Amino acid sequence: MIHPLTYIHPDAKIGPNVKIDPFTTIHRNVEIGEGTWIGSNVTVMEGARIGKNCKIFPSSVISAIPQDLKFRGEETHTLIGDNTTIRECVTINRGTSDRNQTSIGNNCLIMAYSHIAHDCEIGNNCIFSNNTTLAGHITVGDNVVLAGLTAVQQFVRIGSFAFVTGGSLVRKDVPPFVKAAREPLSYVGVNSVGLKRRGFSLEKINHILDIYRILFVRGYNVSKALSIIETEIPVSDERDEIITFIRETGRGIMKGYTRRNEDLA
């Protein structure tokens, strides 16, 4: 059901069984997938591509133009996957010419008052708690949890299955499978609870833990640690994912937690 007090631009494409509550505005060049519900006072702007069975709660703004002074009105998009929930007052900006799109995967939960800036790429099954803020050009892997009030600096990458504790400022890349906390943000262990919930065996979790002991606990520099990991740790998808992630870093990798890190903050 589309409420008569909703405005939908004639060029927008609305799938079957979509429900839109009153006082919502759907701009041109928008596509909304089957079975999606959009609450009242939502604004869906140009370039939005919203998947099937999504839920978008009141007062959210989807696909607004980037908050980037270099943006010159080029046609870009915001992609939202199937079964994703966007809670109250979330803002998501569309891409710039850098990536041409901002994308959020399937089965994500973006909680109230969160902000996702231009050119972010968010994987599947992610949870962003209230007031999570992502600057532009951020890449987040699958199954990532960002606790409330987390702020992520532009161009940072967060690896799959990572967990970042509430109130964190993320300035450096966060590798896959880890738990990150403290200030400055540091490795404080493997995300064992999240991995168990996703079906990882104890053997697999210990395998990942062995990798991060070499990288963060034994005191090696990154290049030496990677060399030891490749020599001593059996080949696995998880090992290769971690090595590739670290080698591709642009901003650098967060450190392991020590009392000295905290003293220097």
Segments (PLM) and residue ranges:
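Structural signal for interior beta-strand "rungs" in well-ordered beta-sheet cores
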Residues: I2-S186
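Terminal amphipathic alpha-helical/low-complexity segments used for targeting or macromolecular assembly
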Residues: M1-L5, P10-D11, P16-N17, N53, ...
